[in-house]
Swiss-Prot record:
One of its GO terms (biological process) is tricarboxylic acid cycle. It comes from Bartonella henselae (strain ATCC 49882 / DSM 28221 / CCUG 30454 / Houston 1) (Rochalimaea henselae). It catalyses: (S)-malate + NAD(+) = oxaloacetate + NADH + H(+). Substrate binds at residues 83, 89, 121, 152. NAD(+) binds at residues 10-15, 34, 96, 119-121. This is Malate dehydrogenase. Its EC number is 1.1.1.37. CDD domains: LDH-like_MDH.
Length: 320
C-alpha cells in the first residue's frame, strides 16, 4: 500500500517541527512548500539526514511551487506572518488573509480531496476564509486551536496539582483568542471535576481563575519570552494529533475550530467546539450542555470571531 502524503504549506518554525514529528511517527511522506527559496529544501534535507539516526522511513521533499502538493491526503497550513511582542492575533488579519487566498487557490487546484488543517492566525477567521477560497467541503477543513489551548490548560493544571498531565482532561471552547472559554465544569483530574477538587481543598477558585487567565494568555506569554517569534512545538504537536486521527480513522474526540451550521445556535462560522475526527474529517460536532454563564462567554467569543470574518469580507468582498 502506498504511503500517505502530507503537504506542509509554510516552512517556518511550525512547518519544520511538523515535518520532524511526522517523520518520527512515520505518518506519511512529507512535502514542504514555501515561497522562500531554499528554506523548504534545506529543512527537508536536514530532517531526512536525521532519519538514519532516529530510524524512520519517510520521503521528505522541499519545493517552491504548489504542484508539489498534488494528491496530498493531508494539508497543514502554517503560511503567513507570526506574532511579535505587543501584537494580537487579530493584528495579522490583513496580511495573512492575502496568504490564505493564494493557499486556497493552490489547494483547490492540486489537493481538493485533502483534509486541511489551518494553523495561521487569527485562526478562526483564517480557516473560515481558507475554506471559502479553496471550495473544499466544510467537514474537510478545520482549524488547530482547541487542542493547543486545552493542552496549555491541562499543563497548568498538572503543575498546580503536581500530578501527571495524562490524568488531566480539559477542553476549551470558542475562538482562539482572548475570549476563549476554558470549561472548568467539564475539566477533571482522575475523573474528579475541578469544582469538586476546590471543595475538597486541593486548590482554590482564585488559583483556578489564574490558570484560566494564563491559558488565555498562553500564546502571548511565549511570544513575550521568545521576542522574535511565537510558539511552535506545541502547535505542531497539536496539528499532528489531528492529522493522525484523520489518517488512522481513530474517531478522536478533540476540540478544533470547526464549521458550525446551526449547532450551538451558530451558522456559517468556524469556532472551537468538540468534534469527532475520523476518515470523513469532522464526522460529528458534539453539542455539550452549557450553563447560563458558559453560554454567555461562548456567545461573546463567537461574536468576536464573526467580527473578524466581517473584517475579512471588507478586505476580500468575494468571501461574502
Amino acid at each position: 500500500m502506498a504511503r500517505k502524503k502530507i503537504a506542509l504549506i509554510g516552512s517556518g518554525m511550525i512547518g519544520g517541527t511538523l515535518a520532524h514529528i511526522i517523520g518520527l511517527k512515520e505518518l506519511g511522506d512529507v512535502v514542504l512548500f514555501d515561497i522562500a527559496e531554499g528554506i523548504p529544501q534545506g529543512k527537508a534535507l536536514d530532517i531526512a539526514e536525521s532519519s538514519p539516526v532516529d530510524g524512520f522511513d519517510v520521503s521528505l521533499t522541499g519545493a517552491n511551487s504548489y504542484d508539489v502538493i498534488e494528491g496530498a491526503d493531508v494539508v497543514i497550513v502554517t503560511a503567513g506572518v507570526a506574532r511579535k511582542p505587543g501584537m494580537s492575533r487579530d493584528d495579522l488579519l490583513g496580511i495573512n488573509l492575502k496568504v490564505m487566498e493564494q493557499v486556497g487557490a493552490g489547494i483547490k487546484k492540486y489537493a481538493s480531496s485533502a483534509f486541511v488543517i489551518c494553523i495561521t492566525n487569527p485562526l478562526d477567521a483564517m480557516v473560515w476564509a481558507l475554506q471559502k477560497f479553496s471550495g473544499l467541503p466544510t467537514q474537510k477543513v478545520v482549524g488547530m486551536a482547541g487542542i493547543l489551548d486545552s493542552a496549555r490548560f491541562r499543563h497548568f493544571l498538572s503543575e498546580e496539582f503536581k500530578i501527571s498531565v495524562k490524568d488531566v482532561t480539559a477542553f476549551v471552547l470558542g475562538g482562539h483568542g482572548d475570549s476563549m472559554v476554558p470549561l472548568v465544569r467539564y475539566s477533571t483530574v482522575g475523573g474528579i471535576s475541578l469544582p469538586d477538587l476546590v471543595k475538597m481543598g486541593w486548590t482554590t477558585q482564585e488559583k483556578i481563575d489564574q490558570i484560566i487567565q494564563r491559558t488565555r494568555d498562553g500564546g502571548a506569554e511565549i511570544v513575550s519570552l521568545l521576542k522574535t517569534g511565537s510558539a511552535f512545538y506545541a502547535p505542531a504537536a497539536s496539528a499532528v494529533s489531528m492529522a493522525e486521527a484523520y489518517l488512522k480513522d481513530t474517531k478522536r474526540v478533540v476540540p478544533v475550530a470547526a464549521y458550525l451550521s446551526g449547532q450551538y445556535g451558530v451558522k456559517d462560522t468556524y469556532v472551537g467546539v468538540p468534534v469527532v475526527i475520523g476518515a470523513g474529517g469532522v464526522e460529528r460536532v458534539i453539542e455539550i450542555d452549557l450553563d447560563k454563564e458558559e453560554k454567555a462567554a461562548f456567545e461573546k467569543s463567537v461574536s468576536a470571531v464573526q467580527k473578524l470574518c466581517e473584517a475579512c469580507i471588507a478586505v476580500a468582498p468575494g468571501l461574502k
